[in-house]
Structure formats: structure tokens, C-alpha cells
Amino acid sequence: MVELNSSIGASFNLLRKVKALPAYCEIHTDCRLVQLEGHEPFCPKCAKKSIDERNNNVVLEGTWRNYRRAFHGVLRCDSIFDDFELKKATFDNYETEPNTEAAGNLLKARQIAGKYLDRDYKANTIITGAPGVGKSHLAVSMLKAVNKTIQPDASCLFVSVNELMRLIKASFDSKGSEFTEARMVKLLGGVNLLVLDDLGSEASFQSSSREASEWVQQVLFGILNKRNRTLITTNLTSEELAKIYNPKLLSRMYKGIAKQNGVIKFTKATPDKRMVIF
């Protein structure tokens, strides 16, 4: 109460220093100018308008920041990487040699990314091949190109499947975790374009023929059942995927792929870039 009374007293003291002048505002001709001791004369109505505009600008800036966060910010803030170097990946820094399989796959990735700029394009894409050939690099590049160019703006997200499952499992014993199964299924199911990176790794670290757990398949089904625009990278062939996942889940993964020629395949013709060190 003492602070409030002091504040009111200070305001009244300030008001006592304001003098009304005989001159009128050129804009608000019915309003006399006033002057605060030691300051230039001003029009109260002009001052109020200036304050209102400043407040409106603050609100608009906040709204714009929230808008950008809801779309462009999703890729930057909500993506789940297990290799943070992938954040730097673009089409421009994807290294290839002319007339190679990798160069052809780069071109195809650019073309498919262009298709995803059409919101009516409903099909998944699978990028398959051995580890280290650049599958994830291409997927991130495609995602960035769409996120930057699509109109109107749309949310895009990159998620390492293995890391996703680890974080969801950790949430079981962590009250208040943002990585609950329900939240992640909702987030991944709702973005415009999603990358599921390294699909199959969550089941194949121990044995390539090991079936993915029922819980993992339920989580993946919950995500893919809500979607029709997903980029999937995997080290596995369709035959190997069939040993890991049940047919209902596979049908969600392969949605629209055959019709749209949506497979980018790396063979032994493309070497593991991470192994070429000398």
C-alpha cells in the first residue's frame, strides 16, 4: 500500500508540472497543446495515438513471432536429431560426382521436394540404402527446401526414429516430460511434412530379422495413420522391412509410393562417405 500511495503521489506531482498552452494542435484542432516542464510542447491526442500504435506494433510483433514459431520454428525447435551435423545439411552441400548414382538421387530428391510444395500432393517417399551414403542428408535438404518455400507456410519436422523411441520411453519415469507418447504422436501426426529417419534401426541393432516390439509398432502406426506426406529413410530393403513390421503398418509406410515413383534407392555403386577417410 505504501508503494501504491507513493506511485500515485509521484503521478500527481508530475501532473502539477504540466501546463496547458494557448496554442492548439494542427492535427487535432480542438485540442490545446500542453507542456511538461523541461520538455517540448505536445498534443495529448497525438501522444495517445503514438502510444497506441507502439502497443499495437508490440502485439503484432508478438503475433508474427508466434506465427513463425508455429510453422518455420517447428523444424528448428522440435526436430529430434541423433547427429547434430545434419542440421547443416542442404542440397548445396551434398557432395556428388557427375554421372553417378548419388548425383541422380540428388536430382530426384530435388524433384520430389518440388512436388511437396503442392499441398494436394499426397504420397510418402522412401530413401533406402546402406549406412553413410547420404540418405539423411537428402531428407533434411528436402525438408528445408519445402519449409522455406511452401505457400502458405507449413510446419515441417525431422525425427530420428531410434531417438524418438528412447525419449518416449524415458518419459515413462519422468513426470512432466514433453516427450510423452500422446504428445509426440499428436505432433508428428499433425505436421505438414515429416521425416522419419533411420526407420528400422530401433529394431535392427541386435538382429536384422528381429521383429520390432508391439509397442514400437503401435507408436509408428499411430503417427503414420494420421499422415499422407512423410519422408522415410532406412537402411533396409522392402523384404527386410516386411520381417520387422506388420502388414498394416507397412501399408501406411508405402502410401502413394508406387503410384508416384517415390523411392530413392542407393546401391553398392554409392560408397559409404563416412568410411572414405584416406
Give a label for each model feature.
Residues M1-G104, K268-F278:
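A short, basic N-terminal segment
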Residues A103-R110, N147-G190, E211:
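Short glycine-rich substrate-engagement loop in P-loop NTPases that contacts/grips substrate
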Residues Y121-V140:
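Walker A/P-loop nucleotide-binding motif
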